């Protein structure tokens, strides 16, 4: 639907929303004051008061248009009003992932020149205090929560959020004209945020996104997918991620959708039945975990339970393909016996699941479609603000990331000779264009201004014709965009064949025994896998077999466990081409995590880190290859 107010900048979005909802008691945000409390609403009157008080404080401290203000916080109400205050005065939001180590946080603050730094908890404040002396531009640190360690609060440059809101309220009148002047000076081409790409290699790069970049993407998204004031969203993907920022925040408030903040990523399953949202925006990892939990539950059940489940899935498949008549009645029975229980876990009201950030394995996409819980896949990059393509409700294509959104053009460029194999704009539909595989390029108002302080990287990303090179391999299939993998992930085996590990990994991750996997085999005669088992499932298997083990290391060393994985991989590899089949593997005792450095904050695998960390296992796999 169209947005509920006109706007060309995020500054105008806030001002016009505040004016529209003034005095009407419209709730916008919901949060939990304590873990055991109910969700509390915050209406637009309070949002407006808080934003103006905060803007007054920042202006009074000398923050001007174009100055950078940092946020290191989980998703919460305070994050939103700090951002809106930054946008109101023409500042630039620099948000950091809470999982970043101090050294990376310091680098981002130094590179961007952040002047005021907002942090959430005592834990994040401790990190900020630790790096303060290394960040000469930072004038003060403002904490949302009062820290338990009193000495942190005693630092002369540390202030409490409640205190500065009160102070801002006191100086609001004397700064109101300055705020108005700054807000009127904001132009669509002005940078509104620096989003530092976590990157699987090298130092983070700050993508400069303008008001026009994000506003164009918000408007295109609201044309492409319908939501309105009757909807509610449970927000849990990090707001420093461009996907959540654009789709789960700006697009939502621009359409009147109410936003509930999950207590944390770990409490999403608990919060869903409490909130009963109608929209869920996530990454494939959540859907993979939901799917594997369901499969695990079914396989541990009786033969009758398995038969009912398989019948329900087959019935759902027939119904999703358009079969009616008797199938309609069977679908109602399948819902009652199987699928309604699954829907209850999400609160029972979700009408839109939106997935982005990575490709969703087709098997998982198909399963949720059979359950009547369609997932709308989308595709984009931080550098494209982020959405380039998305599926529309009722027009989904399994295995595709959708059609190109309005205002954007996507092209496929040959990897061999750089020829454009085909291109589609959002305005070209209906189109049945199909192409071969190549690199995905993008052009449009959503393409970033460039990388902050990094002209070299900007020129490598955006060519002289204005095409942004995504580094992803994909193709058009009757107008729908399909993603294969990252170009840099391509493995060239000893026979010279090009193999993309992503689709192989996606297939194997649908096994209930496999939590994470990285395919290896560069310049080798076969493919192999470094596998993180699903420790809950395999522990139960070992105990049921009467096997003894004290920890994960002992568990993965058991012959019976390795035999189990050999059979499972052999079974799944039947679906793969000969040169793609996994011929060997090694189990590892620990999950790949952000904290241990194997994955990025956006849950992308750092293949080089894993290759280094488990190099001895990889060498062992291929040491006996005498083919």
PLM region spans:
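AMP-dependent adenylate-forming
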Residues: 14-42, 149, 589-591
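Conserved AMP-binding/adenylate-forming core of the ANL superfamily
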Residues: 29-84, 101-106, 160-164, 211
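Conserved AMP-binding A3 loop
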Residues: 41-45, 192-218
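Conserved structural elements of the adenylate-forming
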Residues: 48-53, 188, 207-228, 340
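Structural core segment of the AMP-binding/adenylate-forming
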Residues: 60, 88-167, 564, 570
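Conserved pre-ATP/AMP-binding loop-to-beta segment of ANL
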Residues: 143, 159-162, 169-196, 203, ...
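Conserved ATP-binding/catalytic segment of the ANL
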Residues: 428-493
């Amino acid at each position: 639907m169209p947005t509920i107010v006109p706007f060309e900048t995020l500054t105008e979005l806030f001002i016009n929303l505040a004016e529209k909802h003034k005095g009407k008691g419209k709730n916008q945000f919901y949060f939990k004051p304590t873990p055991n409390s109910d969700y509390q609403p915050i209406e637009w009157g309070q949002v407006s008061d808080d934003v103006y008080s905060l803007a007054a404080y920042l202006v009074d401290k000398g923050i001007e248009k174009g100055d950078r203000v940092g946020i290191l916080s989980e998703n919460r109400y305070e994050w939103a009003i700090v951002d809106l205050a930054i946008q109101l005065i023409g500042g630039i939001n620099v948000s950091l992932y809470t999982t970043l180590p101090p050294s990376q946080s310091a680098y981002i603050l130094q590179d961007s020149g952040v002047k005021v730094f907002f942090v959430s908890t005592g834990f994040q404040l401790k990190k900020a205090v630790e790096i303060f002396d290394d960040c000469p531009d930072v004038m003060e640190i403002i904490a949302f929560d009062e820290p338990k360690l009193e000495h942190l609060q005693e630092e002369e440059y540390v202030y409490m959020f409640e205190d500065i809101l009160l102070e801002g309220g006191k100086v609001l009148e004397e700064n109101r004209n300055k705020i108005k002047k700054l807000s009127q000076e904001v132009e669509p081409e002005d940078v509104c945020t620096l989003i530092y790409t976590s990157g699987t290699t090298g130092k983070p790069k700050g993508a400069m996104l303008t008001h026009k970049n994000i506003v164009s993407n918000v408007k295109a998204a609201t044309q492409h997918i319908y939501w309105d004031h009757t909807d509610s969203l449970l927000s849990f993907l990090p707001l420093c991620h461009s996907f959540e920022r654009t789709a789960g925040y700006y697009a939502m408030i621009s359409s009147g959708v109410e936003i509930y903040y999950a207590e944390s990523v770990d409490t999403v399953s608990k919060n869903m039945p409490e909130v009963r949202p109608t929209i869920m925006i996530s990454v494939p990892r959540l859907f993979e975990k939901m799917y594997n939990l369901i499969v695990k539950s079914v396989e541990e059940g009786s033969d009758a339970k398995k038969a009912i489940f398989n019948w329900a899935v087959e019935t759902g498949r027939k119904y999703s393909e358009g079969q009616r008549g008797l199938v309609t009645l069977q679908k109602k029975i399948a819902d009652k016996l199987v699928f309604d229980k699954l829907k209850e876990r999400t609160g029972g009201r979700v009408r839109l699941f939106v997935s982005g950030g990575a490709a969703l394995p087709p098997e998982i996409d198909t399963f949720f479609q059979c359950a009547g819980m369609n997932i709308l896949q989308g595709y984009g990059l931080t550098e494209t603000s982020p959405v380039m393509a998305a599926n529309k409700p009722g027009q989904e294509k399994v295995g595709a990331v959708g059609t190109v959104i309005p205002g954007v053009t996507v092209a496929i460029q040959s990897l061999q000779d750089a020829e454009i194999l085909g291109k589609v704009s959002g305005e070209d539909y209906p189109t049945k264009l199909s192409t071969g595989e190549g690199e995905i390029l993008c052009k449009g108002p959503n393409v970033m201004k460039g990388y902050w302080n990094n002209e070299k990287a900007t020129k490598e990303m955006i060519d002289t014709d204005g095409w942004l090179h995504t580094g992803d391999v994909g193709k058009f299939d009757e107008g729908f965009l399909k993603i294969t993998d990252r170009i840099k992930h391509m493995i060239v085996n000893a026979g010279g064949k090009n193999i993309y590990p992503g689709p192989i990994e996606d297939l194997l991750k649908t096994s209930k025994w496999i939590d994470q996997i990285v395919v290896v085999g560069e310049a080798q005669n076969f493919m192999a896998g470094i596998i993180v088992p699903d420790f809950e499932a395999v522990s139960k298997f070992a105990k049921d077999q009467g096997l003894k083990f004290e920890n994960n290391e002992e568990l993965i060393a058991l012959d019976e466990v390795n035999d189990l994985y050999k059979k499972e991989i052999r079974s799944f590899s039947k679906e793969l081409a000969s040169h793609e089949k996994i011929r060997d593997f090694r189990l590892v005792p620990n999950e790949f995590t952000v904290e241990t450095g194997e994955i990025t904050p956006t849950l992308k695998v750092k293949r080089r880190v894993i290759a280094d960390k488990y190099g001895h296992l990889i060498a062992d796999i291929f040491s006996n290859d005498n083919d």
